[in-house]
Curated annotation (Swiss-Prot):
Primary gene name: CGR1
Lineage: Eukaryota, Fungi, Dikarya, Ascomycota, Saccharomycotina
UniProt source species: Eremothecium gossypii (strain ATCC 10895 / CBS 109.51 / FGSC 9923 / NRRL Y-1056)
GO biological process, one term: rRNA processing
Comp. bias (Basic residues): 96-108
Subcellular localization(s) per the UniProt record: Nucleus, Nucleolus
Protein name as annotated: rRNA-processing protein CGR1
Disordered, as annotated region: 96-115
Keywords: Coiled coil, Nucleus, Ribosome biogenesis, rRNA processing
One Pfam family this sequence matches: Cgr1
Coiled coil: 40-101
Role noted for this protein: Involved in nucleolar integrity and required for processing of the pre-rRNA for the 60S ribosome subunit.
Entry GO CC: nucleolus
Similarity field: Belongs to the CGR1 family.
Length: 115
């Protein structure tokens, strides 16, 4: 009894003759093959639900990202096609060198705008 008190420290009340008592029931101690309490079951279920939601969100985000990439690629293709057609229409009207100069100038202007 005195050994327990020395390990733990002296009582605040100063009653050194009081012995340290253990729990009568073993419910608070870890027991092998112990059934989970309802609170622990709920906690585990919440964790599983949270993991499921995270996985679902990750899949949704991945799917949306792929969709956005497809849309972006399609938009770029359309813009390139449109620009090519426009240059062809201009080339039909003007001399080839002049069209090439215009194309370079527009690229330069576009680069300046994007800065």
């Amino acid at each position: 009894m005195a050994v327990k008190n020395l390990e733990k420290g002296i009582n605040v009340s100063g009653r050194v003759w009081k012995s340290e008592k253990d729990a009568f029931r073993a419910t608070s101690k870890v027991i092998k093959n112990k059934k989970l309490t309802s609170w622990e079951l709920k906690r585990e279920q919440r964790q599983l639900d949270q993991q499921f939601k995270e996985r679902m969100n990750a899949l949704k985000n991945e799917k949306e990202e792929e969709r956005q990439q497809r849309i972006k690629a399609l938009r770029e293709r359309r813009e390139k096609k449109e620009e090519k057609e426009r240059y062809e229409r201009l080339a039909a009207r003007m001399h080839a060198k002049k069209v090439e100069r215009m194309r370079r100038r527009e690229k330069r202007n576009k680069a300046l705008k994007e800065r």
